[in-house]
Curated annotation (Swiss-Prot):
Species this protein is from: Dictyostelium discoideum (Social amoeba)
Gene for this chain: exoc2
Listed Low complexity bias regions: 807-833
Description of how the protein assembles with itself and partners: The exocyst complex is composed of sec3/exoc1, sec5/exoc2, sec6/exoc3, sec8/exoc4, sec10/exoc5, sec15/exoc6, exo70/exoc7 and exo84/exoc8.
Protein name: Exocyst complex component 2
Location of region: Disordered: 1-32, 605-629, 804-835
Family named by the database record: Belongs to the SEC5 family.
């Protein structure tokens, strides 16, 4: 058999097979019937004669049938007219007894004129006369033959009737029949047996489908064709039960046994956690169709609820067992719980939705097969209709008469005061009219349109004063004919009752307010009683109410089931995440910073070469022994939080309502908040102690990602900047899942700003609280003192002579004693301090700290803000600007700290050079060169410039430092020169001081500003109005006053001299002109030394 036959056999129409045992062939069982038939034949007198009709039939079979050939007896027409086809031939044939002359003339010769008819009559008379003559001639010519035939017939009749020939023939036939019976009786009995066997085979072939059903059902089950198995099972029960044959009961028992095993298999599939969703749907749908049977699962009830409850019990048991596993750390248990939830709950929820809605999807292959059958049936119907139409057209063409289809105008009214008119014939139905009317509406998914018969009847009251209108709406069936209804209403023509068609949606209510006549007035009275009758309305309403109640109950049960699972999962995860007895996660405590401090210290190791190696910004390397790695803990926290968020998003993605997810939403929020606080606190704490990792290593390696990224204008930074940026980025990356939760970002932003500010604290600690930096001043002074002693010994310079006033000398003595005590204490501290590295001195470390601070202010803070925006897709607030402003203040403080240290060293040189250098300002010769202490100071400034460029390579910082030192240099020179006793100052001494000032101004010309210009003018005025006599008169007689009073007194003398406006004979302009050649000569000699100051 072909594959098509096999496929069709799976869905055979078993209704065609019936058990009919009376349907057998009837054949004679004995030859006695033949004998009886022969006797009857002999007794029949007409048996040997052939009737005239039979003879005409036999002759007609041999001859050509020309009865359809047209012949006009009048000889006028050769072709029949169209009207003749619809008239009976008996009425037109002259030889027929029912010939009608009127019909002949009206149908055949209706268009023939009178002249032709007259000629035809003559011809007809001639033919009649000639035919009579022919008959007479025939009889005359063959008269002898007629007489002989008559005599022969008489003789044959006498011979048969008078002789015994017929009896002898009858006896011979009887003998033949008896002998045939003897011979053929066994054959006939065998034939009867064969017929009985054939009948049994026929029945077996007819009901072979029933016998094959057990095997077919088993084959369908093996191939997972559950729909076919259910189809065959139901049809087998129908056929066997309707036949009521005991022979088929055994087959039915076998089928029931197979079905029971199939039910057990389906229930086991429902209880198996690895069963896929499609298989679950098929299993539940199959069980709902074939029932639970009579076995162990007969009392289960609804198979879908059995699956839901079984799966619920399995999930809750697994969650409890997993959460109580003490062999795994908490973060791994949380991971297993999340995997368990994601692998079971989605399928459980989807099946629950089908359970609530009370429907399951059908098998696509089975539906496709049914659709193909329907399409084939429709095609066959269309072919039949086309053939019928062709036949009708051919009949109409043959008859020459086309019948016009009758039709009527049908007016359909709508609720929006409009109506439509359609032409309907007898073949159109109500469903066709509905399709025409619904084209004017915009349909929605749930719309259902109906056509109603609107009947209106007015009833007068007994006193005939009021009239009540009764309106009745009757829904029309789709098979009714609008043509017949319209004709019926037109034929009645009743004045007391009106009918019309109304088209509307089924859920729309019909009221008298929305029914208006064409003129705008209401058709119905306000007292109209409206009754709407729908097809099967009461049954549909009852079914809808029961379905709604069942769905609500199922939804409540299933909702509680899902909520219980979510609450159990949330409680276990929260308990594991916040369990204080475990060491898997760090908890908030008062000693958190101290623990982190110890951890950072423990992760710092020194190799044999003295180079420090430490962990990255994310938490450092591993400690020793039992030390917990905070980086691993944070990673585990990130994984757990992401797993819980993934569970939440996946459950939301499958359409689970928020009511079901309330517990997991609360869990997610709690974990996220705790995780954010933990990560932010770790980030701030790590940044707070980064100064411990400062080993003053320069970012010179090209492999370092931050070697060029964090440098401003080519400034050099240390690897501490990389540690800082890595720490921030690593911790922020752990919070990347907050990109779609902008409401939680303010705390992260605040923590980022706090971390940047904490890094500023680290820089402040490195700049101001480091003991090695505190010793910078003393190191510089000691080195300067040693250099000067060596220089004096080599050059043979005379010892220092103090030319200051007695008060100033006493004050200097006190200052020296105090400085000696401070220096002794700091030296002791310096001996006890330890350094991580000796590669950079204290000044260079201070410059590197300044460079790091400038980098944070100028670039790193902006880069971190960009990283934050790119990571979370949210802008930052204005708090970061305030933090940058604070760091800018710190940058200026560090710069001033460095400048003050250098100014202190330069100020000591100025004090020694002006007051204690051993030279005198009371000379009589003109100056020839710049003072040596000025050259020493400028040389120190060259060293400062070189130190800045070598250490941090910053032109801006070097410019700012030199400019500030330049200002301090002028202020200090003016102040110290004002402390010199005027008795020891001559005009030549003033010229020497003016030469020094001019030399400094020319060398540092590029670093001048308004302040230096003012200071230079003040110095010139001091020299111009300095008068020794006035200085003596204003000197205080008492020498026991403090140094502060002395300074105020000298200042008052300076301003009193200015107020007098007198002069001492010293001309600034002339002196400057005289000193110009000497100045140029000294500048040329030192141009190479001070070339770094030329910008």
């Amino acid at each position: 058999m072909s594959s098509s036959d096999d496929t069709s056999s799976d869905y055979d129409d078993y209704d065609d097979y019936e058990l009919d045992e009376d349907d057998t062939e009837k054949e004679p069982s004995k030859w006695n019937n033949v004998r009886d038939g022969w006797q009857e034949f002999l007794e029949d007198e007409t048996a040997f004669f052939v009737s005239q009709e039979d003879q005409s039939k036999q002759s007609g079979d041999i001859q050509i049938d020309d009865s359809n050939k047209f012949y006009d007896p009048l000889g006028i027409l050769k072709l029949p007219p169209r009207k003749a086809a619809s008239v009976k031939k008996e009425l037109l044939s002259l030889e027929s007894e029912s010939f009608s002359p009127v019909t002949f003339l009206s149908e055949i010769h209706s268009q023939t004129n009178f002249t032709e008819l007259s000629i035809g009559v003559k011809k007809l008379k001639e033919e009649s006369t000639s035919k009579a003559k022919e008959i007479k001639y025939l009889v005359k010519e063959n008269f002898e033959h007629f007489v002989k035939c008559k005599d022969t017939v008489d003789e044959v009749y006498n011979l048969i009737s008078n002789s015994k020939m017929l009896e002898d023939m009858s006896g011979s036939f009887i003998k033949i029949i008896n002998k045939s019976s003897t011979v053929y009786d066994p054959l006939l009995s065998n034939k009867k047996k064969a017929d009985e066997i054939r009948k049994v085979l026929t029945l077996l072939n007819k009901y072979k489908v029933i016998f094959k059903l057990p095997g077919k059902i088993q084959e369908n089950i093996k191939q997972n064709e559950y729909e076919k198995a259910v189809h065959n099972y139901k049809n087998a029960k129908t056929l066997i039960t309707s036949s009521q044959k005991k022979e088929f009961q055994k087959i039915l028992l076998d089928i029931e046994k197979i079905a029971e095993d199939f039910r057990i298999q389906l229930f086991h599939a429902l209880a198996d956690p690895s069963t896929k969703l499609e298989q679950l749907k098929k299993s539940i749908k199959t069980l709902m169709e074939i029932g639970n049977g009579k076995g162990d699962f007969s009392q289960i009830g609804d198979p879908c609820w059995y699956f839901l409850s079984t799966r619920y019990n399995a999930i809750t048991l697994l969650i409890k067992q997993c959460s109580e596993d003490n062999t795994l750390p908490n973060y791994k248990i949380i991971r297993k719980l999340s995997i368990l939830l994601l692998s079971n709950v989605p399928n459980l929820f989807k099946m629950g939705v089908y359970y609530i809605e009370g429907k399951f999807e059908d098998n696509k292959e089975y539906l496709r097969y049914k659709q193909q059958q329907q399409i084939q049936l429709q095609q066959q119907q269309q072919l039949i209709q086309q053939q019928q139409q062709l036949q009708q057209q051919q009949q109409q063409q043959q008859s020459g008469k086309t019948k016009d289809s009758k039709s009527v105008n049908v007016v359909v009214y709508y609720l929006d005061e409009t109506f439509s008119s359609y032409r309907m014939d007898q073949e159109k139905k109500v469903k066709d009219l509905i399709e025409l009317c619904r084209k004017r509406f915009i349909e929605e998914e749930d719309d259902e349109f109906c056509l109603y018969k609107l009947s209106e009847k007015k009833i007068k009251s007994e006193d005939k004063s009021t009239t009540t209108t009764n309106i009745k709406l009757l829904e029309l069936s789709h098979d009714e004919s609008p043509f017949k209804l319209q004709k019926k209403w037109a034929d009645k023509n009743s004045s007391t009752k009106n009918h019309r068609f109304l088209f509307k949606r089924k859920n729309e209510e019909f009221t008298v307010n929305n029914s208006k006549a064409g003129n705008g007035t209401s058709i119905y009275d306000k007292e109209a009683n409206i009754t709407q009758i729908d097809l099967n309305a009461s049954y549909k309403t009852h079914k809808k109410q029961n379905s709604a109640a069942t769905s609500a109950m199922n939804e409540e049960k299933f909702k509680q089931l899902i909520i219980n699972i979510m609450e159990l999962y949330s409680s276990k995860v929260e308990q594991l995440f916040f369990d204080q007895n475990q060491e898997d996660f760090p908890e908030d405590s008062d000693d958190e910073e101290e623990n982190l401090f110890d951890q950072i210290i423990s992760t710092t190791s020194v190799n044999e070469d003295g180079n420090h190696h430490h962990g990255g910004g994310g938490g450092g390397g591993g400690g020793g022994g039992d030390t917990i790695n905070s980086s691993d803990l944070s990673i585990h926290m990130v994984e757990n939080v992401n797993e819980v968020i993934k569970c939440q998003e996946m459950l939301q993605g499958i359409g689970m309502p928020e009511l079901y997810l309330s517990s997991i939403n609360s869990l997610t929020e709690s974990l996220i908040l705790h995780f954010i606080r933990q990560i932010c606190s770790e980030m701030v704490a790590e940044v707070s102690f980064l100064y411990l990792l400062e080993d003053w290593t320069i970012n010179e390696s090209s492999e370092d990602a931050l070697a060029s990224g964090n440098q401003v204008d080519g400034m050099i930074t240390t690897r501490l900047m990389g540690e800082f940026v890595n720490t921030i980025k690593v911790n922020l990356a752990k919070l990347s899942f907050l990109s779609n939760k902008p409401m939680l970002l303010p705390s992260v932003e605040s923590a980022l700003c706090e971390a940047i500010e904490s890094f500023g604290d680290c820089l402040h600690h490195l700049a101001f609280n480091n003991e090695s930096i505190q010793s910078t001043i003393e190191d510089s002074l000691n080195q300067m003192s040693n250099d000067e002693k060596a220089e004096n010994e080599l050059n043979g310079i005379i010892p220092k002579i103090d030319i200051s006033s007695p008060q100033q000398q006493q004050q200097q003595t006190q200052n020296q004693s105090q400085q000696g005590q401070v220096q002794q204490g700091e030296n002791q501290q310096q001996q006890t301090s330890s350094y991580m590295t000796t590669e950079f001195n204290s000044s260079e470390k201070l410059l590197l700290t300044l460079s790091n601070c400038s980098t944070v202010v100028s670039k790193t803070a902006v880069q971190l803000r960009g990283f934050y925006v790119g990571l979370f897709h949210q802008p930052m607030g204005s708090y970061l600007k305030k933090v940058i402003e604070k760091l800018g203040v710190l940058e200026r403080l560090i710069l001033e700290r460095y400048v003050n240290e250098k100014n202190l060293m330069i100020g000591e040189f100025i004090t020694r050079g002006v007051l204690f250098s051993g030279s005198t300002w009371l000379v009589n010769s003109q100056p020839t060169k710049v003072s040596s202490f000025i050259l020493t100071i400028l040389t120190k400034m060259v060293f400062i410039h070189h130190e800045i460029m070598k250490t941090i390579n910053s032109i801006d910082i070097s410019f700012g430092v030199i400019q500030r030192i330049f200002e301090f240099l002028l202020i200090s020179l003016r102040h110290n020169f004002s402390l010199v006793d005027p008795l020891f100052i001559s005009n030549e001494g003033k010229s020497q001081f003016l030469l020094d000032i001019l030399f400094i101004e020319n060398v540092l010309e590029s670093y001048g500003n308004e302040k230096t210009v003012k200071l230079s003018s003040f110095i010139r005025k001091d020299l111009l109005f300095l008068n020794p006599i006035q200085q003596q008169q204003q000197q205080q007689p008492t020498q026991s006053i403090s140094h502060q009073h002395q300074q105020q007194s000298s200042t008052s003398r300076f301003y009193s001299t200015l107020n007098y406006g007198g002069g001492s004979g010293f001309n600034i302009n002339a002196t400057t002109a005289n000193l110009d050649p000497i100045l140029k000569r000294n500048i040329e000699k030192t141009s190479l030394l001070f070339s770094c100051f030329k910008i």
